[in-house]
Amino acid sequence: MKKIKKYALAGVNIEEGDASSSIAGKFAGTTFAGRKNKIGEPVKLLGGFAGILDFGKYYLVTGDDGVGTKMEVAERLGKFDSLGADLVAMVSDDAVCLGAEVVSMTNTLDAAKLDRKIVGELLKGLAHFCLKQKIVIAGGELAEVGDAVNGMVWNATAIGIVAKKRVILGDKIKAGDIVIALRENGLRSNGFSLARKILKDNFGKDWHKEKPALAKAGVGNKTWGEILLTPSEIYHAAVLGLVGRFGEKRSVDVRGICHVTGGGIPGNLPRILKNKKLGAKLDNLWPIPKFVEELIRLGKVDLEDAREVWNLGNGMLIVVAAKDTARSLKILAKNKIAARIAGAITNSGKIEIV
């Protein structure tokens, strides 16, 4: 992926981040030999959304993520109850891309100074959203680390399970398959450094209190802080309605699932197209939310760059066999997830967004 100039100006070095991820992956790979021919042997995946361990008849799926600098917005507003949705979404929606049902999560909160009221709000929210997804909080860690961090850092690990014969790797995707887009009304937990930089540059240090220009953004009387804190949609349970929880029957022929996080659609959809001759034509994605259009305008961000930073209203893409399109949309609607046909898989070898 090319370097995104605006993101670099916001203090995010994409090139260094990619290089660091590559180094981390390299050393993680050196540990795989330790489980060779043993229970829990890792399955090597290229570009997957989570790790896979072989447990005989099923795979254990693991993944880690966090809420990133969305926490800073919560700290500005003094509102922490909805961040649990973001934490659950980041890890469970990665795992379900492989067809896995997440059964448990652990979380780690590092804080300059612990505050029992804030911890209570965070964990009460996390418990609420986990219970809705039928996920157990199996453990966690709270650490007061002084000036090692500025504010708080909240991350989680998810553990999921999927039958071997039911794992979704994207290798069965073919031209003519339909791409369904699931709507997202916020930024999820990605691209906040850029959004915050744009708003600070335009409105100063108290940007989160700004209201006047928001009539154009279609968000009523909300402040920019409230808008950015919009909780993520959690797709996990709805997607399980398509692929089935562990031991349940699969309702439709799902061939690939893409969680649209950092990198946007251009950076994430290719991860599930194992046949590099395949591409996609997306001519009916969900429209860009009005507030994101306003961010793009305020920051003078190129649309191409915006696509690689934010989800632009499309939080997940699901590739299904054409014959199962209508049934898929019906199941997603039943699970209260807004979904639409966004396009189709092609033989073009490229992602075309119209």
Regions found by a protein language model. Name each.
Residues K2-A10, I118-V136, V145, V149-M152, ...:
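Glycine-/charge-enriched secondary-structure boundary and capping motifs
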Residues K26-N185:
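Glycine-rich phosphate/pyrophosphate-binding loop regions near the starts of catalytic domains
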Residues K2-G34:
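N-terminal amphipathic/basic leader segments beginning at the initiator methionine
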Residues S20, A24, V91-S92, A195-I198, ...:
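Buried hydrophobic packing segments
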Residues R166-A215, G220, W224-G225, P266:
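Short, acidic (Asp/Glu-rich) active-site segment that either coordinates a divalent metal cofactor
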Residues G17, V67-K70, A163-R166, L187-S189, ...:
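Short, acidic Gly/Pro/Ser/Thr-rich loop/turn segments
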Residues N13, D65, G176, H259, ...:
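Residue-level signature of catalytic and energy-coupling elements of molecular machines
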